[in-house]
UniProtKB/Swiss-Prot annotation:
Transmembrane segments: none annotated. Pfam families: Crust_neurohorm (PF01147). This is Crustacean hyperglycemic hormones 1. It comes from Penaeus monodon (Giant tiger prawn). Residues 1-27 form the signal peptide. InterPro entries: Crust_neurhormone_CS (IPR018251), Crust_neurohorm (IPR031098), Crust_neurohorm_sf (IPR035957), Hyperglycemic (IPR001166), Hyperglycemic1 (IPR000346). GO terms for cellular component: extracellular region. Its main location: secreted. The keyword Electron transport does not apply. The gene is CHH1. GO terms for biological process: circadian rhythm; glucose metabolic process; neuropeptide signaling pathway. The modification Valine amide is found at V118.
Length: 120
């Protein structure tokens, strides 16, 4: 009888931990990266806002620029890449190098204009 209770309590504890872990995981972590691009509610205003960005606050543009930095970090796995890429509201050499490396040439001008819109 005590063995049954012990197994039962371990099973309940495991289920409780699974429930807590699944409820605290962000929706973006469970979905592919492209799935969250169209949903504005996946990013809060505070998570996208950078005080150095004094231009137009456009979530879609900020998300697109941030994605370049995230992808660049995933390729190079250097800790400073993600932060340096976003510094000065994406108007820096690291962002330009990431853009050159990751994006097709026909998208470069579009991203340069986005940096100008959200930047200074």
């Amino acid at each position: 009888m005590t063995a049954f209770r012990m197994v039962w309590s371990m099973l309940l504890a495991s289920l409780l931990m699974l429930l807590v872990a699944s409820s605290t995981a962000p929706a973006d972590a469970l979905s592919p990266p492209a799935a969250g691009l169209g949903a504005d509610h996946s990013f809060t205003k505070r998570s996208l806002f950078d005080p150095s960005c004094t231009g137009v606050f456009d979530r879609q543009l900020l998300r697109r620029l941030s994605r370049v930095c995230d992808d660049c970090f995933n390729v190079f796995r250097e800790p400073n890449v993600a932060t340096e890429c976003r510094s000065n509201c994406y108007n820096n050499e690291v962002f330009r190098q990431c853009m050159e490396y990751l994006l097709p040439a026909h998208l470069h001008e579009e991203h340069r204009l986005a940096v100008q819109m959200v930047g200074k």
